[in-house]
Every structure is written in structure tokens, then in C-alpha cells.
């Protein structure tokens, strides 16, 4: 009878384990929580790995028990601690202490630590979870600490080894709104990989790809974060507020994001000097502008994701935003016109602008493992945009005491659909990545003012692409070859009539190839890619849009695509990485200025194809952890070989030094310095140096769930653009004072950070 009771108790206990989860907390010998440890469930006697989990920032983990009545053990591993094996007798494992992993060499103690930076082929990986980078208050700051990543001072955003703005993936899910990236908590990030040579599966305009891998987390319930930032400027105030909520139940996540962005009389200064050389006169127009921005914007995102199993997952999201929903921008512009150094006109122009954009984005995806060697990832995207831009301009002639009113009104609507399917198939030692991408766009635009006459514009665009890439290892050498074919049918309509001159059909083959190999302790990658830049619909228009009394904007229907053959060498040695890129650009598309054919007293800004030229860009990055200090230095050299092609071809140099100092677990100091020399940026010459100093202090509270930070940005207000364009007839100088100097204060609170709505795995995993 006792044996029967004992057997029943064992069966009941085993059943209870099979239906529950093992929970525990990992701490070090000094009782500090251990994050990013691997907790593995193993069945005996076959030593089969059944389930895995990772401890969070508090050292807490939850390991689902799916062993189905088998004998089990739990193995805990961490790069900095000795492995530990447990034979569980109950689901609550309590507090588990791990011993540091050390190798004793006399009196020297070596602690095991994974390198922060590693290069694998064309990718450079940063181990965020095992470095002090996870303590940064914001993901935006973290991205700036990635190797080869620097702030872009031309188009905003980031550059990766000088290759322009990258695109982002979170757990191999493409995100089109950077706010999704900026609002991630660095503590939730396991690692980040930089793909310096995107393959054929990406649009050729993509210069680099940043893959963010989040920590695997378990647990049901509500989680989220609340964030707020205040920018106190010398003139004006800017405010950003966000709320991110996620609810998980089983294998389903529901999420909601809300953001608000407000400007209160933010000042912006701009000075222009435009000179025109004609026979027999020399004309010069100077302008000084002061703008106040008072716009208020808002955005909302909702969505869900669901895992049917470890092999199949779906998800969808909808994002909507209004920029702005209220608030006008006011500008006062003082002008003076000179002919042969004698003033002939003096004006005061007053602008009242309300440029509103309404955006609606949607995404749905499926990803699955169809067989052991075949994966599929499918995305359907929609982007809808509605814009309503109005400007009321009063032009005062101070010499004649007269005034002229100009009203500009532009409305546009656009609908864009995109379908992309990507397959990844393992064939022996190699991997074949192939798929297709289809898109359709329809856009209408009306523009009118009481100074110029323009037609109603309609654009249609149908695109299709097929791509394939083959990766294969040859010993220690990794090779990858890819080919992408793109077809685009672009229709341009004016007043419902198709313009055959501006309508285009494009067909292009775009190859790429890369070879990666080690040499002693250095990892090298050599790559080649062909890229194309096609003119946008608005760049093909040949009507003039009123910008100011002396300047019109105009497209060019005769522009043809720009082709770029790009060769790159990338090398990584320990904490140092370097990139050298050489490009041959054909039919380069750049801005140009000329006299207007409509009004000889007006300058037209347009675009055109320039002759071929070559470009050299080198980037050197050094980054390491020195005790509590992590410095990162990025040096960039840019040199166009375009004499007699572009208006300028002088070299440019930039340096960026970032410093993170972790005083302890609660205090963090950031010191950022950057410098940009005079030199060429595209077709412009930057005639003034730029530099910036940024200092921040962050304080973590409540076991790092609450972060308060503050500091000064651009302490000396030196990150302002001073550009110049010259040709035989025109000299245009522009000075922009962004009033970057400000005091920035922020607060970020994360609660129940055990859920993760980005649950995809992606075809590349």
C-alpha cells in the first residue's frame, strides 16, 4: 500500500513539474543580480536540450517545463561564471549563487569575457548584454557607440562606415519608423550586428543594415515603459513624450505605443547670399531669416504578434501620425538686392506656414520554417500619406513702401503597397537566399500660387524585383555572391494627360560579391556592389515652384539614373576596425543653379546629371573597455576626385570621440566630442568648420528600472552648416544656425520588462 501511495505521489509530482515552469533568481557571490545567463532544460539520459531561458536585469528567469515526465537537469551557464547543474525537486528554485570563472596564473587573475566587438564576414557584431553599453539610458545613445557608426551631419540620422543612413531590423523584423528603435531599452538588447555589405535581398539604396537582437524573455502580463524628454533652448522649448505598453498571454502579444512631440517658439536662423554674374551686371541678394516653430505632433501604433510554434509566427501593426496637428511656423526675412554693389531693393517678407502631413502605415508578416532546411519570411506593407501645405507670404518693398501678397497651397496624396517574400535554403554547407519584391504606388499632387501657374500632377509607379544570393564557406574563407534584377514602370501625368517625356521604364541588373578571410589575428572582407539612384517623381517635373521673390525650384525631366560601382575593404583587429571604400559614379545626380527662363531676375534651383567621377572614403574605428571607461574614436576621410566635374572637390575630415564612464551600478557619465573640417559634401563646399561638445549624467534607481538623465547638447553652438555652391554664373552661400545648444533632461521608467513584442526570428537566423 505504501508503495502504491509513493508511486502516486511521484506521478503527481512529475505531472506538476510537466505542467509548470521553473523559476529562480541568479546572483553573484556579492549578491548582485546576474543578467544574460543561459538556463537550459536537459532530459536524461540522452542529454537532449528541451527548453532555454535567459535571466533578466534582476537575475530572474522562468524556464517552461516541457520535458513530458522525463528525468531532467537544469544547466546554468554564463561567460563570466562557472557552469552550474541543478536537479530540481520543485518549481521554485529560489536564489542561486554563481561563482566567477577565473584562471589563476600566479597572482594574475584572468576573468573570462567575450569580446565586445567581433567581425564575421561582412558583419560586425557588438555584444551589448556583456558590456557596459546596456547601462546607457537610451537606445539612440547606444547606436552611436556601435563600431563604425557616426552621426550624419548632412541628412540626419546615422552613417555606418560612411555609407549613409542604414535600415533597422529588430529580431529580423524590418522597422520603418526609427521611433521603434529609439524607444527600445538597452537593457533588453542582447547584441547588435552591422551588415556593412547588404546583399541582393535589399534595395540598392540601402547602404548598411543594423540587426538588433533582443534578449529572449518569458512571462505573461503587462509590461512597458514611460519616457519624457525636455529640451530647454536659449529661445524655445521642445518636448517629447512616449508610452509603450505590451500585454502578453501565452504565445500572443498585444502592444500599444503613443507619442507626442511639441515645439514652443523654437528659433532657427538662416543667412543667404546669392550672387549672379551676367553681362554687363553683377547681382547680389542677401537675406536674413528668423523662424519660430510652434508645431505639435502625435502618433499612435497598435499591433499584435503570435507564435503558433517555434516554427511559425504571424504579426501585424498599424501606425498613424499627424505632423503637426496644430501650430504654425512664422518666419521674418530681411532682403537686400544689389546691382554692381549699388542697392536697388530692400524688403521685409513675412511667412506664415502650416505644413501638415497625415501618415498611415500598416504591416503584416508571416515567417516560418517550412522544412529543416527551408525558411520563409513574407511581409506586406502599406504607406499612405496625405499632405496639406499652406504658406501666406507678405512681401514688403521698404524702398517704395509697397507690398505684395503671395499664397501658396500644395496638396498631395500617396498610396504605396509592397509585398516581399524571402526564402533561405540550406544546401550542403552553403545557403541560398532568394525571393521577390513587388510594389505599387499612386500619387496625386496639386500646387498653386498667385505668382506662377502649374498643372495638376499624377504619378504611378509599378516596381518588381527578383533576387538571389549564394553563401558558401571554403575552409576559413567565406564567399557570397548575389544578383538583383529591378524593373520599374513610372508614369507621369499632367492634367490627366500622360507625359511620354517624363514617364520612364527602368530595367537594371545589380550584382554584388564579397570574400571574407582571416589573416593571423585580423579578419578581412573584400566586396563589390553596383548601386543605382533613380530620379524621384518630383525631380522630373519641369514646372517652377515659388520659393522666394528671387528663387524658384524646378525639376528636370531629362535626368537619367545614376550608377555607382563600389569596392570596399573592411578589416577588424581586436577593438580596431577600418573600412576603405572606392566608388566610380556615372551620371551623378546633383543640384545646380541657373538663370530662370521665365524671369531673368530670378534664379532657378534644379537638378541635372554631372559627368563621371570617383570617390574615396576611409573610416577608422577604435573601441574598448578600460575598467569603468569605454572610449570610442571614429575618424572619417572623404575625398571626391571630381575636378572640372563638381563645383568643388576638396577633401573633408571628421572625428568623433565618445566616452562612457560607469562610476558604479547607479551613476553613468557620457562625454561626446565631434569635429568636421571644411571640405566637400556632395556638390557643396562647407566653408566653416563644425564642432560639438555634449555632456550627460545618468542616475539609475529602483534596480535600474528608473533612469533620470540630463546634460548639455552642443555646448558652444558650433554644429551649424555653412555651405557654398559655385558655377560660372552663380554663387550661393547659406549659413544655418540651428540653435543646437540646449539643456536636455529626461526620465525613463520601465516596468515588468519580461515581455518582448518583437518575437520574430527571421530567415537569417
Give the ranges of each region predicted by the language model.
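Short, acidic, small-residue-rich periplasmic hinge/interaction motif at the N-terminus
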Residues: 40-42, 75-81, 93-132, 163, ...
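Short, acidic Ser/Thr/Gly-rich low-complexity loop/linker segments typical of extracellular
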Residues: 45-60
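Short acidic/polar hinge/loop motifs at secondary-structure boundaries
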Residues: 64, 173-199
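N-terminal periplasmic accessory domains that precede
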Residues: 91-98, 107, 139-142, 157-159, ...
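Extracytoplasmic beta-strand/coil segments of soluble accessory domains associated
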Residues: 140-173
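Face-selective signature of the C-terminal outer-membrane beta-barrel domain
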Residues: 297-325, 349-495, 518-523, 577-578, ...
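Outer membrane beta-barrel strand-and-loop segments of large Gram-negative receptors
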Residues: 416-420, 463-467, 560, 566, ...
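Outer-membrane beta-barrel signature, preferentially recognizing the C-terminal barrel domain
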Residues: 459-461, 501-504, 532-586, 603-616, ...
Amino acid at each position: 500500500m505504501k508503495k502504491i501511495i509513493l508511486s502516486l505521489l511521484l506521478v503527481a509530482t512529475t505531472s506538476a513539474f510537466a505542467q509548470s515552469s521553473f523559476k529562480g533568481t541568479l546572483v553573484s557571490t556579492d549578491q548582485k543580480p546576474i543578467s544574460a545567463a543561459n538556463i537550459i532544460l536537459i532530459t536524461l539520459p540522452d542529454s537532449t536540450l528541451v527548453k532555454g531561458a535567459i535571466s533578466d536585469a534582476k537575475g530572474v528567469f522562468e524556464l517552461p517545463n516541457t520535458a513530458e515526465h522525463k528525468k531532467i537537469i537544469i544547466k546554468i551557464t554564463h561567460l563570466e561564471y562557472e557552469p552550474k547543474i541543478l536537479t530540481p525537486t520543485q518549481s521554485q528554485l529560489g536564489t542561486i549563487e554563481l561563482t566567477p570563472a577565473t584562471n589563476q596564473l600566479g597572482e594574475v587573475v584572468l576573468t573570462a569575457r567575450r569580446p565586445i566587438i567581433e567581425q564575421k564576414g561582412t558583419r560586425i557584431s557588438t555584444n551589448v548584454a556583456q558590456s557596459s553599453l546596456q547601462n546607457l539610458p537610451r537606445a539612440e545613445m547606444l547606436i552611436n557607440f556601435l563600431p563604425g557608426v557616426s552621426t550624419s551631419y548632412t541628412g540626419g540620422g546615422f552613417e555606418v562606415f560612411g555609407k549613409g543612413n542604414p535600415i533597422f531590423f529588430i529580431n529580423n523584423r524590418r522597422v520603418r519608423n526609427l521611433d521603434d528603435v529609439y524607444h527600445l531599452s538597452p537593457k533588453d538588447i542582447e547584441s547588435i550586428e552591422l551588415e556593412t555589405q547588404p546583399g541582393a535581398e535589399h534595395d540598392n539604396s540601402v547602404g548598411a543594415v543594423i540587426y538588433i537582437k533582443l534578449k529572449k524573455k518569458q512571462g505573461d502580463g503587462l509590461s512597458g515603459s514611460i519616457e519624457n524628454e525636455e529640451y530647454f533652448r536659449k529661445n524655445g522649448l521642445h518636448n517629447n513624450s512616449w508610452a509603450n505598453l505590451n500585454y502578453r498571454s501565452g504565445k500572443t502579444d498585444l502592444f500599444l505605443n503613443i507619442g507626442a512631440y511639441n515645439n514652443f517658439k523654437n528659433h532657427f536662423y538662416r543667412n543667404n547670399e546669392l550672387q549672379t554674374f551676367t553681362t554687363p551686371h553683377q547681382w547680389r541678394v542677401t537675406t536674413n531669416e528668423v523662424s519660430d516653430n510652434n508645431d505639435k505632433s502625435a502618433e499612435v501604433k497598435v499591433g499584435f504578434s503570435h507564435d503558433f510554434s517555434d516554427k511559425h509566427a504571424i504579426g501585424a501593426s498599424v501606425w498613424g501620425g499627424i505632423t503637426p496637428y496644430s501650430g504654425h511656423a512664422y518666419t521674418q526675412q530681411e532682403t537686400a538686392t544689389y546691382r554692381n554693389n549699388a542697392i536697388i531693393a530692400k524688403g521685409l517678407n513675412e511667412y506664415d506656414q502650416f505644413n501638415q502631413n497625415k501618415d498611415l502605415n500598416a504591416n503584416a508578416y508571416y515567417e516560418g520554417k517550412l522544412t529543416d532546411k527551408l525558411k520563409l519570411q513574407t511581409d506586406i506593407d502599406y504607406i499612405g500619406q496625405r499632405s496639406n501645405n499652406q504658406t501666406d507670404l507678405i512681401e514688403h518693398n521698404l524702398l517704395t513702401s509697397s507690398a505684395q501678397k503671395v499664397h501658396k497651397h500644395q496638396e498631395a496624396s500617396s498610396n504605396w503597397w509592397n509585398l516581399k517574400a524571402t526564402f533561405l535554403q540550406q544546401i550542403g554547407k552553403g545557403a541560398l537566399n532568394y525571393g521577390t519584391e513587388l510594389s505599387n504606388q499612386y500619387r496625386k499632387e496639386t500646387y498653386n500660387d498667385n505668382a506662377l501657374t502649374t498643372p495638376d500632377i499624377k504619378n504611378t509607379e509599378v516596381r518588381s524585383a527578383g533576387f538571389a544570393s549564394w553563401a558558401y564557406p571554403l575552409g576559413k574563407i567565406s564567399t557570397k555572391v548575389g544578383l538583383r534584377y529591378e524593373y520599374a514602370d513610372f508614369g507621369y501625368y499632367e492634367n490627366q494627360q500622360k507625359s511620354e517625356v517624363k514617364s520612364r521604364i527602368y530595367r537594371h541588373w545589380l550584382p554584388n560579391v564579397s570574400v571574407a578571410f582571416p589573416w593571423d589575428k585580423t579578419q578581412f572582407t573584400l566586396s563589390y556592389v553596383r548601386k543605382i539612384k533613380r530620379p524621384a517623381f518630383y525631380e522630373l517635373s519641369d514646372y517652377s515652384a515659388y520659393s522666394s521673390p528671387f528663387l524658384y525650384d524646378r525639376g528636370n525631366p531629362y535626368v537619367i539614373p545614376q550608377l555607382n560601382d563600389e569596392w570596399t575593404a573592411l578589416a577588424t583587429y581586436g577593438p580596431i576596425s577600418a573600412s576603405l571604400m572606392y566608388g566610380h559614379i556615372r551620371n551623378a545626380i546633383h543640384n545646380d543653379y541657373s538663370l530662370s527662363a521665365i524671369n531673368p531676375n530670378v534664379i532657378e534651383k534644379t537638378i541635372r546629371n554631372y559627368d563621371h567621377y570617383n570617390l574615396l572614403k576611409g573610416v577608422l574605428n577604435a573601441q574598448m573597455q578600460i575598467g569603468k571607461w569605454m572610449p570610442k574614436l571614429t575618424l572619417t576621410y572623404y575625398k571626391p576626385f571630381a575636378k572640372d566635374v563638381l563645383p568643388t572637390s576638396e577633401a573633408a575630415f571628421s572625428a568623433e570621440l565618445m566616452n562612457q564612464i560607469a562610476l558604479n551600478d547607479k551613476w553613468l557619465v557620457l562625454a561626446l566630442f565631434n569635429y568636421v573640417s571644411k571640405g566637400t559634401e556632395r556638390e557643396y563646399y562647407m566653408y566653416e568648420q563644425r564642432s560639438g561638445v555634449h555632456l550627460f549624467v545618468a542616475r539609475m534607481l529602483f534596480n535600474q528600472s528608473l533612469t533620470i538623465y540630463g546634460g548639455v547638447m552642443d555646448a558652444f553652438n558650433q554644429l551649424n552648416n555653412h555651405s557654398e555652391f559655385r558655377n560660372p554664373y552663380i554663387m550661393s552661400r547659406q549659413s544655418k544656425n540651428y540653435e543646437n545648444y540646449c539643456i536636455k533632461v529626461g526620465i525613463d521608467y520601465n516596468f515588468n520588462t519580461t515581455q518582448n513584442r518583437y518575437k520574430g526570428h527571421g530567415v537569417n537566423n
